[in-house]
Amino acid sequence: MKKFLITLFCAAVAIGASAQGGKLAVNAGFMFPSTLNATIGYEHPLSYGNAVELYGEAGNHWQEKDFWKGYYWDGGIVYKHRLVRYKNGMLRFRFGPQFGAVQKRFFIGLEGGFEYSYVFQNGWEFALIQKNNVNFLHGDTFRNGLLLGVKIPF
């Protein structure tokens, strides 16, 4: 019985020590039309390099006279399907629903795009994200752009 418990304990420790844990993702960038964007999220890895990310983001449409009047916030979940795996990097396709508000008006939408991530030796990742958002129920229908970010393992 002792051997069985020790073997079970060692197996649990070995499984918990894998490098495939969750990551904190922090991104910022520019989107069209005239939008600053910042995103924070949690990425949970799946098998074969795929992942799911739960995120929240805030942004602002900069305008000449009223800079803070064009803000928005939203949140959502994105499935990331691995397209190509490199030695230290990966190209993924991102797709998922989102919801939020812009100028006190609620919206729902879809997000799609691509993400390239490069992994450093310490486990941190650099991410280059191309996003396309299509939103419904208000005037801010399309947003697309580039974001740069890092992913920090837990």
Regions found by a protein language model. Give the residues of each.
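Short glycine/proline- and aromatic-enriched beta-strand/turn motifs that initiate or cap beta-hairpins
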Residues: A19-E64, K151-P153
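Membrane-embedded beta-strand positions in outer-membrane beta-barrel channels/transporters
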Residues: A25, N37-T39, D74-V78, E111-G113, ...
